From Swiss-Prot:
Protein name, as recorded: Chaperonin GroEL 5
One of the record's GO cellular component terms: cytoplasm
GO biological process: protein refolding
Disulfide-bond pairs as recorded: none
Organism: Mesorhizobium japonicum (strain LMG 29417 / CECT 9101 / MAFF 303099)
Catalysed reaction, written as an equation: ATP + H2O + a folded polypeptide = ADP + phosphate + an unfolded polypeptide
Pfam families the UniProt entry points to: Cpn60_TCP1
Stretches that traverse the bilayer: none
Signal peptide, first to last residue: none
Length: 549
């Protein structure tokens, strides 16, 4: 086991505080509409330029082990806030730095660290309750756009694009952000259910120009296993032919004789048909087939359920207004499923999302939910260079997460005003003077984000904070973009309450632990062994004996 280096009390806390300050000072320059960018060196490729707090925090690794511990704890604040709320990482870092600094002073003055932490926790719980009580629910698309604009660093095109996407796919719909191949940023919406499987044979194509198979008012046969023998399918194929409606077969695979016969029938014009593979694998495939069945009002033909293919009737097939199949994707628009059943399935998937602990499973369930509930919107972020595209994509991601959070829990005045106001209304009472000091630490920390936003905009932080607090209006604040004071909500400067709340809770949680640390242990640096030269005392001569080649 390697030797360890141990630091105690004041020495430990001071080193840790240095680490906290280095990381927080690098992150906090990005806060607010006039926050600056940070350039991050990459071992390969061009440097990355970003204004995203968590991206900056994740890049910082310090040489001194003890300073690094402090920095990593604050990095954890930013990451945790990002995971839960998706935005507010810089605010969380600024709050954590302030709590650690004030806490360090209090401990140095002889106060009890555990009581300070209890006081911090009391104050935070009080502030969170105040924030939730004062939150305003989002009702209009304009309000969604405002949240997106603020989180997107004042870029109104980002805000309006996210608002449009949410309007089209609903609040439950999936909105993904991708890098575009062009300079333009555009929004593409796929309505209905789309999955990433295309036609099994190009002979199924109905539109040769676009190479897609469009089938209107189609029947949909959902089969769990492979189809290789056509004999079992004949009864249902004959029934579909008589209705003169098209048929889409979705199964694990269609191969051999079955596929050849379907293609021949399609080419002869007797049967409008297309076959695609079922999406997903294993249990997820079963679940997705079940989703399609509920969406289209059909039934999955599965031997587990005792249903044989030869016994299938038209009433077991799904229906859809339109099925569009390209080489890579299949889209089912306007399925004939019952509303109540679809809503029941949506509720079931939501329940699974809450219960699962795996991020991967959560993401896949979220995709399934979106396909059932609304649709999928893709925002393709463009720019002149790769560096610009990456920087803009960071902002669009933040804006998207912020708008989702705003729709979920509502909004409060932005620009750090909600926290600044909350500092005046903390009613928590400490059991002793040290706990009261902990409450005061939070009261001071709550002013830090508003002060930092003002400082980044070139204003005098103390004057701005004082002027906001002089005015009794709950939504009165400072617009750092224009340098004016006024009603923040009327000016469209709003923050999602979930983001503000999460930032404060995560910052206080980690900062409270840092304040209570009394000893720190790190691996001792390895001493360089003395003596140079070549290993094993090999003589430094040449390889003369190897001549003659």
């Amino acid at each position: 086991m390697a030797a360890k280096d141990v630091k105690f009390s004041r020495d430990a806390r001071e080193r840790m505080l240095r680490g906290v300050n280095i990381l927080a000072d690098a992150v906090k320059v990005t806060l607010g509409p006039k926050g600056r960018n940070v350039v991050i060196d990459k071992s390969f490729g061009a440097p990355r330029i970003t204004k995203d707090g968590v991206t900056v925090a994740k890049e910082i690794e310090l040489e001194d082990k003890f300073e690094n511990m402090g920095a990593q704890m604050v990095r954890e604040v930013a990451s945790k806030t990002n995971d839960i709320a998706g935005d507010g990482t810089t605010t969380a870092t600024v709050l954590a730095q302030s709590i650690v600094q004030e806490g360090h002073k209090a401990v140095a003055a002889g106060m009890n660290p555990m009581d300070l932490k209890r006081g911090i926790d009391l104050a935070v719980a009080d502030v969170v309750a105040t924030l939730i009580k004062n939150a305003k629910k989002i009702k209009t698309s304009e309000e969604v756009a405002q949240v997106g604009t603020i989180a997107g660093n004042g870029d109104s095109s980002v805000g309006s694009m996210i608002a449009e996407a949410m309007q089209k796919v609903g609040n439950e719909g999936v909105i993904t952000v991708e890098e575009a191949k062009t300079a333009e940023t555009e929004l593409e919406v796929v309505e209905g259910m789309q999955f990433d499987r295309g036609y099994l044979s190009p002979y199924f194509v109905t539109n040769a120009d676009k190479m897609v198979a469009d089938l209107e008012d189609a029947y949909i046969l959902l089969h769990e296993k492979k189809l290789s023998n056509l004999q079992a399918m004949l009864p249902i194929l004959e029934a579909v032919v008589q209705t003169s409606k098209p048929l889409v077969i979705i199964s694990e695979d269609v191969e051999g004789e079955a596929l050849a016969t379907l293609v021949v029938n399609k080419l002869r014009g007797g049967l409008k048909i297309a076959a695609v593979k079922a999406p997903g694998f294993g249990d997820r495939r079963k679940a997705m087939l079940e989703d399609i069945a509920i969406l289209t009002g059909g039934q999955v033909i599965s031997e587990d359920l005792g249903i044989k293919l030869e016994n299938v009737g038209l009433n077991m097939l799904g229906r859809a207004k339109k099925v569009s199949i390209s080489k890579e994707n299949t889209t089912i628009v306007d399925g004939a499923g019952k509303k109540a059943e679809i809503q029941g399935r949506v509720a079931q998937i939501k329940q699974q999302i809450e219960e699962t602990t795996s991020d991967y499973d959560k993401e896949k369930l979220q995709e399934r939910l979106a396909k059932l509930a609304g649709g999928v919107a893709v925002i393709r972020v463009g720019g002149a260079t790769e560096v610009e595209v990456k920087e803009k994509k960071d902002r669009v991601d933040d804006a998207l997460n912020a708008t989702r959070a705003a729709v979920e829990e509502g909004i409060v005045p932005g620009g750090g005003v909600a926290l600044l106001r909350a500092s005046l209304s903390i009613n928590a009472v400490g059991a002793n003077s040290d706990q009261t000091a902990g409450i005061s630490i939070v009261r001071r920390a709550l002013q830090a984000p508003a002060r930092q936003i003002a400082a980044n905009a070139g204003a005098e932080a103390s004057i701005v904070a004082g002027k906001i607090l002089e005015n009794k209006g709950a939504t009165y604040g400072y617009n750092a973009q224009t340098g004016e004071y006024g009603d923040m909500i009327a000016m469209g400067i709003v923050d999602p309450v979930k983001v503000v709340r999460t930032a404060l809770q995560d910052a206080a949680s980690v900062a409270g632990l840092l304040v209570t640390a009394e000893a720190m242990i790190a691996e001792a640096p390895k001493k360089e062994s003395a003596g140079g030269g070549m290993p094993g005392g090999m003589p430094g001569g040449g390889m003369g004996g190897m001549g003659g080649f």
